[in-house]
Curated annotation (Swiss-Prot):
Keywords: Cell inner membrane, Cell membrane, Glycosyltransferase, Membrane, Transferase, Transmembrane, Transmembrane helix. Pathway: Glycan metabolism; osmoregulated periplasmic glucan (OPG) biosynthesis. Pfam families: Glycos_transf_2. One of its GO terms (cellular component) is plasma membrane. HAMAP family: MdoH_OpgH. It is a multi-pass membrane protein. Its EC number is 2.4.1.-. Belongs to the glycosyltransferase 2 family. OpgH subfamily. The lineage of its organism: Bacteria, Pseudomonadati, Pseudomonadota, Gammaproteobacteria, Enterobacterales. Involved in the biosynthesis of osmoregulated periplasmic glucans (OPGs). Seems to be required for pathogenicity. The keyword Transmembrane helix applies. It comes from Dickeya dadantii (strain 3937). This is Glucans biosynthesis glucosyltransferase H. The chain crosses the membrane at residues 148-165, 203-225, 521-543, 577-599, 612-634, 689-711. It is an enzyme of class 2 (transferase). The gene is opgH.
Length: 850
C-alpha cells in the first residue's frame, strides 16, 4: 500500500461533506503523504512537535469540528495547552476548596485518657441561632420519644417470645445442675449432662437476638403502614414547601454521577432523560451535570468520551454537561466525590449524587432544591428511589417487592428517625458547604481487612453531617426518583459482598466521639443486616445438634446425687406452633399490609386486585426459596471479612444477564451438597424434624435451579404479559423511563466497542481522545524518551497483546496517541498486524452526524 492510497483511505474515514471530500481526494490523489493532509486540515496554529510523527496534533481541531461541531459550543470548548496542542475543555475552571478529614479515634479509652490530660480536640460544629435550635428541638423531642417507644415495643415483644421459646425447649433442669458436684464425677457423664443445656442456652440466646431483629423490622413497617394510611405527616420534610416556589438563582446545583467501568450506553441514556426532564421544567439554568469517571478499562474510557460528546451535541449541553476521568483513583467513589468538591464544589450550593443507573425527573430534582431552600438546617435530603427497568424474573420479583413493601419501611424509618435519618449514597441532595467542612473521610487506623479507606461511605457521611449539627432527612413521599436492581441473584451477591465488608468496617465507628445515638444504631443495623445470616445459620446448626442429642443420646434424668424425682425431657407442640405462627406473622404481615394499602389506593396499576395477590404469593415463594441461599452466602462473606480472605467474583459475560448452568453449579454446588446431606441426615434421624427444616434444606437443594431460572428474561417477560409482578412504572411508565429506554436502544445501535483501537485508527475518535488527554509538562528529554519507548513497545507487539496499563498510558498522552495514529496510517506495511486486527473487529464503522 503506497502513501497516496493510505491518504485517500484516511480521507474516506473523515466525516466530510461530499464536496470537500472530493476536493481533498483530487488534491491528494498524487504522491503527497499523510502529513500534508494533516497540514491541510490544520487551522494554522503553531504546535510544538518533537517528532515528525506528532503531525496529527495540528489537525485535531478540524477533525473534532467535522464530527461534533454542534457539541463544541461554537468552538469555545476548544483551548490550547502550553505547547499549543488542542485541549478540549471538558470541565469548568477550578476554584479550589480545602477539604480535610479528622483522624478517627475509635478507642474510647484512649479518648478518655486524652480528655483527662487536656489533649482532647473539640469537634467542628455549626452554630445555630436560637430560632433554629427551637425548631430543631421540636422534632428532636418527638423523635426521641418515638425511639424509646420502638425500643420498648421491640424488647417487650422479644422478652415474651424468648420466654415462650424457653418453655418449648425439651430440657428444663438447669436449676438442678450443680457444677461443684460434677467436679467429682466422670468427665464423660458430665459432658452428657451438660451438652443438651449448653445447646439450649445457645439456641435461646440466638433466638432472642434474631427475634429482636425481626421485631424491629415489624414495628418499622407497621408505623409506616399507619403513616401512609393516614396520609398526613406533620413532620414530613416534603410538607415544608408548596412545590411552586421560584428557585433561588444564587443557589446552583450540580448533578454528579460517579461511574467506574459501567455500561456506557445505559449511563448516558439515563443521563439524557434526566437532563431533558430538567429542561422541560424551565429551570435548567440552575443545574450543571458532571460525569466523574473512575474507569480504568481503555475501551470503556474511549466509549465514555464519545458518548459524552454525542450527548453534548444532541442536547446542546456544551458548557453545562461536563466529563472528567481521574488518573489517580483514590478512595474509590467517596474519593471521586471529594475530588469534585475540592475542585468545583465552591461553585454550587447543592449537589445531587446519582448512581450509574439513576434516573430522576425534573420535578423531583427541583422539588429537592426547593426543600433545601426551605430548610436551611437540612444537610442531606434523601429521596426514595423506585426500582424499575429490568426484565428477568429475579429482578421483577425484587422490583415488585421494593415497590409494594418498600414504601412501608421507608415511611417507617422516617417515622422513627425524622431528621437523623439514612443516606443511601445516591438520588439524594446534599448541601455542599457543610459536606466539604465535615464529611471528608479519613482512613480507618490499624491494619487488616477492617482498616484503610472506608468502603460504605454513605452511612458515615450522614453520621458526620448529623454530628456537625445538620439534619439528614428522607423525603419518602417524593415521586420521580428511579434506580435499577441487579438482574440476577449472583449479581446481587457480588454487590452484597462489598456492602457486607463496608458495614462491618463502619461498625468500628460505633464509639467514635460525637456520633448521634441514631447513627450509632444505623451502624449496628448495618452490621446486623449481614451478621444475622451467620447467627441464623448457628441457630439452625444448634437446633439440629440438639435434635441429634435428643434422638441418639440417653437422657440424663437425674442431675444430682440424691435427686428424688427425674427430670423428663418435654415437648409442647402447641406452644411451638404458636411461636412459629407468631414469627411468620411478624415476617409476612408487613407484606400483607402493603397489599392492603395498595388495594385501598387502587390496584389497577399493579394488574388488578386478583393479579396483585397472585404476585404477592409468587414473591413470597421466591423470598422463602432465596432466604436460606442468601444466609449461606452472607455467612461466607462475614467469615471471610473477619479472616481477611478475598472472595473473588469473576463471572463471564452473559447474554441478557442470564446465569449459565455451569456458573450456577459452581456457585451453589456446596449449598446443594449441604442441603442433600442435611435433609438425608434428618430423614434418617427423625422424619418429623425434617418437616420443620424443609423450607431450609429444600431451598438449598433447589438453589442452582432457582438461580438459573430466575435469571431468565423470558420468564420475567411472560409474567409481565400476564400482568404478574407488575408495577406502576410498567403499566403507566413515566416519560423519563420511556425516554431512557428509547435512548438506551439508540445508544446500543451505535455502541463503540474496542474503543482503544478506534482511538488509534479512527480520525474522529483519535482527535477526541487526543484533545481530552493531558500532557502537563513542557519539553523534557526523559519524558520524550519515555513516550518513544511506550510507542515502540506497543508497536512491537500484536495489538491484542498490549496490556491495559500501557493502553491507558498511551491514550492519556496526546503525543503518544498522535504518534501511534500517524505511524499505523503512514506505515501500513510495517504495522500490517495492527491494521488487519482493526479491520477484523466486529464493531460498526463510526459515523458521526453532520
Amino acid at each position: 500500500m503506497n502513501k497516496s492510497t493510505s491518504t485517500l483511505e484516511y480521507i474516506e474515514k473523515l466525516p466530510l461533506p461530499a464536496e470537500q471530500a472530493e476536493a481533498l481526494r483530487e488534491k491528494f490523489s498524487a504522491s503527497q503523504d499523510l502529513s500534508s493532509l494533516h497540514q491541510a486540515l490544520s487551522d494554522g496554529s503553531v504546535v510544538t512537535m518533537q517528532s515528525p510523527d506528532d503531525i496529527p496534533l495540528v489537525s485535531v481541531p478540524r477533525r473534532l469540528e467535522l464530527a461534533w461541531e454542534d457539541g463544541l459550543n461554537g468552538g469555545k470548548q476548544l483551548g490550547k495547552d502550553r505547547e499549543g496542542r488542542t485541549a478540549l475543555q471538558a470541565m469548568p475552571r477550578i476554584t479550589r476548596a480545602s477539604m480535610f478529614p479528622d483522624a478517627w479515634q475509635t478507642n474510647p479509652m484512649v479518648r478518655w485518657w486524652d480528655m483527662i490530660n487536656g489533649r482532647s480536640k473539640p469537634l467542628r460544629h455549626h452554630d445555630k441561632t436560637a430560632e433554629e435550635n427551637e425548631a430543631e428541638n421540636r422534632w428532636r423531642r418527638v423523635g426521641t420519644l418515638r425511639r424509646y417507644v420502638l425500643l420498648l415495643l421491640t424488647l417487650f415483644q422479644t422478652a415474651i417470645a424468648t420466654w415462650y421459646m424457653k418453655t418449648i425447649l425439651p430440657y428444663q433442669g438447669w436449676a438442678l445442675i450443680d457444677p461443684f458436684a460434677m467436679v467429682h464425677q466422670d468427665v464423660w457423664r458430665t459432658i452428657m449432662q451438660l451438652l443438651p443445656y449448653v445447646l439450649q442456652s445457645g439456641i435461646l440466646i440466638l433466638f432472642a437476638i434474631l427475634f429482636c431483629w425481626v421485631s424491629a423490622g415489624f414495628w418499622t413497617a407497621l408505623m409506616g403502614f399507619l403513616q401512609l394510611l393516614i396520609g398526613k405527616d406533620k413532620y414530613s420534610i416534603s410538607s415544608t414547601t408548596t412545590g411552586n416556589e421560584p428557585l433561588n438563582p444564587e443557589h446552583r446545583t450540580a448533578l454528579i454521577m460517579p461511574i467506574c467501568n459501567e455500561d456506557v450506553e445505559r449511563v448516558f441514556a439515563g443521563l439524557r432523560a434526566t437532563y431533558e426532564s430538567v429542561e422541560a421544567t424551565g429551570e435548567l439554568d440552575h443545574f450543571d451535570i458532571y460525569v466523574l469517571s473512575d474507569s480504568n478499562d481503555p475501551d470503556i474510557c474511549v466509549a465514555e468520551q464519545k458518548a459524552w460528546m454525542d450527548l453534548c451535541r444532541e442536547v446542546g449541553g456544551a458548557g453545562r454537561i461536563f466529563y472528567r476521568r481521574r488518573r489517580r483513583r483514590v478512595k474509590r467513589k467517596s474519593g471521586n466525590i471529594d475530588d469534585f468538591c475540592r475542585r468545583w464544589g465552591n461553585q454550587y450550593s447543592y449537589m445531587v449524587v446519582l448512581d450509574a443507573d439513576s434516573v430522576m425527573s425534573g420535578e423531583c430534582l427541583t422539588s429537592l432544591v426547593r426543600l433545601m431552600d426551605a430548610n436551611p438546617r437540612a444537610g442531606i435530603i434523601q429521596s426514595a428511589p423506585r426500582a424499575s427497568g429490568m426484565d428477568t424474573l429475579y429482578a421483577r420479583c425484587q422490583q415488585f417487592a421494593t415497590r409494594v413493601y418498600g414504601p412501608l419501611f421507608t415511611a417507617g424509618l422516617h417515622f422513627w428517625q425524622l431528621g437523623e435519618s439514612h443516606y443511601w449514597g445516591h438520588n439524594a441532595i446534599i448541601r455542599v458547604k457543610p459536606f466539604i467542612e465535615h464529611c471528608a473521610l479519613a482512613p480507618l487506623p490499624g491494619e487488616g481487612s477492617f482498616a484503610g479507606s472506608i468502603l460504605s461511605h454513605d452511612f458515615v457521611e450522614a453520621a458526620l453531617m448529623r454530628r456537625a449539627g445538620w439534619g439528614v432527612w428522607i423525603a419518602y413521599d417524593l415521586p420521580g426518583s428511579y434506580e435499577e436492581l441487579p438482574p440476577n441473584l449472583l449479581d446481587e451477591l457480588k454487590r452484597d459482598r462489598r456492602w457486607c465488608h463496608g458495614n462491618l468496617m463502619n461498625f468500628r465507628l460505633f464509639l467514635v466521639k460525637g456520633m448521634h445515638p441514631v447513627h450509632r444504631a444505623v451502624f449496628l443495623t448495618g452490621v446486623m443486616s449481614y451478621l444475622s445470616a451467620p447467627l441464623w445459620f448457628m441457630f439452625l446448626a444448634l437446633s439440629t445438634a440438639l435434635q441429634v442429642v435428643h434422638t441418639l443420646m440417653e437422657p440424663q434424668y437425674f442431675l444430682q446425687p440424691r435427686q428424688l424425682f427425674p427430670v423428663w425431657p418435654q415437648w409442647r407442640p402447641e406452644l411451638a406452633i404458636a411461636l412459629f405462627s407468631t414469627t411468620l406473622v411478624l415476617l409476612f404481615l408487613p407484606k400483607l399490609l402493603s397489599v392492603i394499602l395498595v388495594c385501598a389506593k387502587g390496584a389497577k396499576s399493579y394488574g388488578g386486585v386478583a393479579k396483585l395477590f397472585i404476585s404477592l404469593l409468587v414473591e413470597m415463594l421466591f423470598s422463602v426459596l432465596l432466604a436460606p441461599v442468601r444466609m449461606l452466602f452472607h455467612t461466607v462473606f462475614v467469615v471471610s471479612a473477619f479472616l481477611g480472605w478475598s472472595v473473588q467474583w469473576k463471572s463471564p459475560q452473559r447474554d441478557d444477564d442470564a446465569t449459565p448452568w455451569s456458573e450456577a453449579f459452581a456457585r451453589h454446588g456446596s449449598q446443594l451438597l449441604l442441603g442433600l446431606v442435611w435433609a438425608g441426615g434428618m430423614a434418617w434421624l427423625d422424619l418429623r424434624f425434617l418437616w420443620w427444616l424443609a423450607p431450609i434444606v429444600f431451598s438449598l437443594i433447589l438453589s442452582p435451579l432457582v438461580s438459573v431460572l430466575s435469571s431468565r428474561a423470558g420468564l420475567g417477560l411472560a409474567c409481565k404479559r400476564a400482568k404478574l409482578l407488575l408495577i406502576p412504572e410498567e403499566s403507566d411508565p413515566p416519560r423519563e423511563l420511556v425516554a431512557t429506554d428509547e435512548y438506551f436502544r439508540r445508544n446500543r445501535e451505535r455502541k463503540l466497542d474496542h474503543g482503544f483501537m478506534h482511538a488509534i485508527f479512527d480520525p474522529s475518535i483519535n482527535a477526541l481522545t487526543s484533545a481530552m488527554a493531558t500532557a502537563r509538562h513542557r519539553f523534557s528529554r526523559p519524558i520524550e524518551d519515555m513516550r518513544e519507548q511506550r510507542v515502540n513497545d506497543a508497536l512491537s507487539r500484536k495489538p491484542q497483546d498490549v496490556d491495559c496499563n500501557l493502553r491507558l498510558a498511551l491514550m492519556s498522552d496526546p503525543v503518544t496517541l498522535a504518534r501511534l495514529h500517524h505511524r499505523v496510517w503512514s506505515q501500513p506495511d510495517t504495522h500490517s498486524d495492527w491494521r488487519s486486527h482493526y479491520q477484523t473487529l466486529a464493531a460498526p464503522v463510526i459515523k458521526s452526524a453532520q
